[in-house]
Amino acid sequence: MKTIIIKMLATTALLFSASTVFAADAPGRTECIAPAKPGGGFDLTCKLVQVSLLDTKEISKPMRVTFMPGGVGAVAYNAIVAQRPAEAGTIVAFSGGSLLNLSQGKFGRYNVNDVRWLASVGTDYGMIAVRADSPYNTLNDLMNAFKDNPTSIVFGAGASIGSQDWMKTALLAKEVGIDPHKMRYVAFEGGGEPVTALLGNHIQAVSGDLSEMMPYLNGDKIRVLAVYADKRLEGDLANIPTAKEQGYHLIWPIIRGFYMGPKVSDEAYQWWVDTFNKLQQTDAFKKQRDIRGLFEFNMTGKELDSYVKKQVEQYREQAKAFGLAK
């Protein structure tokens, strides 16, 4: 009997150890890669977690933020998968735009299955903005001018043709009967550059994400004509009308989060999952999320992995409608 009990205990211990992943200790060095130049949504996403992790003492040393522009995320994605696949302390920011690019095969030979999807930190919404002194006071003003003379309006965004910023603008063009491929669209690298171009009067409108406009909303330089949410947002943003209420069938939420290299150990990955699960419930994190104009959207680990892969498939179908994917 004693022998049987010992064998049962040994078997139970073996099964437990085989099916359970324990989190590793906190990485000694942490880094967040923002796949664009400073000033855009990726920068915002990295800074959010950089501040929150330190404020909550989940890490003892400041997280390094590194900018890796190129291909609207493709350079960073390829670097992590091919050159830095096992770095336990490195996370990379992604957004809905990253997933859209993946759906169109814009990240080269790598696809949605080639990284470890880690955590979301919130959702943003698409928007369109003009200079505060622009003659276009409403979305209808802008789109009517565009419809009358498509070449008179230059749209700018921090991403290339086929990106989510282009798709949002293309959907507006389609609603007023203009071929999206004929609109004047200037692609910049990152969300900060098109704002600079707008303020310099080099373009007439910026298609981007609402969070990217947050630093400018308290001043008198930028006017957001519409936010692509289902209903008006709350608080200080309640004065911004939705595209929907102005007669346009455009709703575009934008997830923001992080992924890791494909060869990061299960233990290291689990530390990050557990840390984000705790972090998302703290007042410090919620404060930083609110400051950056993001709305609650908490997912980690397997749940996020499933969401991301479904979203990529949905984006692929939308891209096909514009002839951007096979």
Question: Where are the language model's segments positioned?
Answer:
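Bacterial N-terminal signal peptides that target proteins for export
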Residues: 1-9
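N-terminal signal peptide c-region/cleavage motif recognized by signal peptidases
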Residues: 17-23
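Hinge/capping helix and adjacent helix->loop/strand transition within the periplasmic-binding protein
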Residues: 26-27, 55-59, 79-90, 102-193, ...
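Short coil/turn segments
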Residues: 37-39, 96, 131-136, 158-163, ...
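Ligand-binding pocket segment of bilobal, Venus flytrap-like solute-binding proteins
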Residues: 69, 152, 157-160, 164-239
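C-terminal lobe and pocket-closing loops
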Residues: 212-281, 310-313
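An extracytoplasmic/periplasmic, membrane-proximal ligand-sensing/linker region
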Residues: 266-326
